């Protein structure tokens, strides 16, 4: 399943290379994911990336959770980076197949000389069985502690820019001062949604 929402804007998603620390939480609706059959095994997730400069861009100490949800149509208002809510017990109880697929590993994007735009695959090392007609969530905490110099050379995610009041489909934050705890309550940002592909067998 390829969900290309748009290519009109680049953002620091799914990881920020220009700040020491950051998070991205992404919500994709059941309708958007409807092509994936019930019982499918999810093998990998890809993000559409633009990298002006070629080379390998590594980030250390990455923490990524994926899950579906039984009742949610958007993220709760008090979403934590790890996918839980600080206040919404129904949200917490209704998560499906909540799986941490990266727990401190190094992830890297290798950008070719050409083309600048590519899909970057992220393997799902743990078994993840799909439940049809349910939304899909990805929560990502970058605890690398360093940044990639340059304002335009590092990889950035492509997606659609949004305006006005939007559902809580994307949470985003970045800073240089300190690691974000996994229980940090996120900032909901209605201005962007990243493109993704989901592969299954």
Give the positions of each predicted feature:
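Exposed, polar/acidic Ser/Thr-rich sequence context and nearby capping/turn residues
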Residues: 1-11, 113-115, 124, 146, ...
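A short beta-strand-loop element at or near the start of a globular domain
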Residues: 6-53
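Proprotein-processing/basic-patch segments
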Residues: 5-7, 18, 134-201
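Compositionally biased regions
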Residues: 5, 17, 35, 47, ...
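Aromatic- and Gly/Pro-enriched, solvent-exposed loop/edge beta-strand patches characteristic
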Residues: 57, 61-164
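Ordered hydrophobic segments in well-structured contexts
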Residues: 4, 24-30, 44-48, 65, ...
């Amino acid at each position: 399943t390829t969900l290309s929402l748009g290519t009109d804007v680049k953002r620091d998603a799914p990881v920020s290379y220009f700040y020491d620390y950051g998070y991205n939480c992404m919500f994709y609706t059941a309708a958007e994911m409807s092509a994936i059959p019930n019982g499918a095994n999810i093998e990998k997730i890809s993000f559409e990336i633009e990298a002006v400069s070629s080379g390998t861009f590594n980030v250390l100490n990455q923490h990524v959770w994926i899950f579906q949800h039984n009742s949610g149509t958007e993220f709760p208002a008090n979403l934590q980076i790890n996918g839980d809510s600080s206040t919404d017990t129904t949200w917490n109880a209704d998560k499906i197949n909540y799986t941490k697929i990266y727990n401190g590993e190094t992830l890297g994007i290798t950008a070719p000389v050409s083309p600048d735009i590519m899909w970057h695959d992220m393997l799902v090392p743990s078994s993840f069985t799909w439940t049809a007609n349910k939304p899909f969530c990805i929560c990502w905490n970058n605890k690398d502690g360093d940044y990639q110099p340059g304002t335009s050379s590092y990889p950035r995610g492509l997606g659609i820019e949004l305006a006005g009041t939007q559902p809580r489909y994307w949470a985003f934050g970045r800073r240089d001062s300190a690691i974000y705890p996994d229980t940090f309550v996120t900032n909901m940002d209605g201005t962007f949604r990243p493109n993704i592909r989901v592969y299954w067998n």
